């Protein structure tokens, strides 16, 4: 299962700004997705590892985490993000 990280379009940024906000301090934790999550990082820097694959994301990135993904989040700088579960 691949994690997608890219720069969002202006339309995606506008749409995500109406979604809830989640924050997290510097930490490391395991997470499993029972539904797909799309998030727009407003602040912070993270690396998410799924087995041998690692993906980094920073403020301004749009990330999509697929349903069924089990991973480890390493929050290197405090995170603030808008999120949407589908």
Tell me what each language-model feature is:
Residues 6, 16-34, 66-68:
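Conserved short histidine dyad/triad with adjacent acidic residue
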Residues 31, 48, 81-84:
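Short hydrophobic/aromatic-rich beta-strand segments that constitute the beta-sheet cores
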Residues 33-48:
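Short, conserved beta-strand element in jelly-roll/cupin
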Residues 67-86:
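Ligand-binding loop in jelly-roll beta-barrel domains
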Residues 1-8, 12-13, 54, 59:
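Cytosolic regulatory regions built on CNB/CRP/Popeye-like sensor folds
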Residues 25, 49-53, 76:
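Short strand-coil-strand connectors
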Residues 51-67:
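Short acidic-glycine-tyrosine-enriched beta hairpin
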């Amino acid at each position: 299962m691949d994690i997608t990280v890219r720069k969002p379009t202006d339309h995606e940024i506008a749409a995500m700004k109406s979604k809830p906000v989640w924050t997290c301090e510097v930490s490391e934790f395991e997470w499993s997705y029972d539904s797909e999550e799309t998030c727009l990082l407003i602040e912070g820097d993270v690396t998410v590892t799924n087995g041998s694959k690692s993906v980094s994301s920073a403020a301004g990135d749009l990330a999509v985490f697929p349903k069924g993904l089990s991973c480890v989040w390493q929050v290197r700088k405090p995170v603030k993000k808008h999120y949407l579960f589908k």
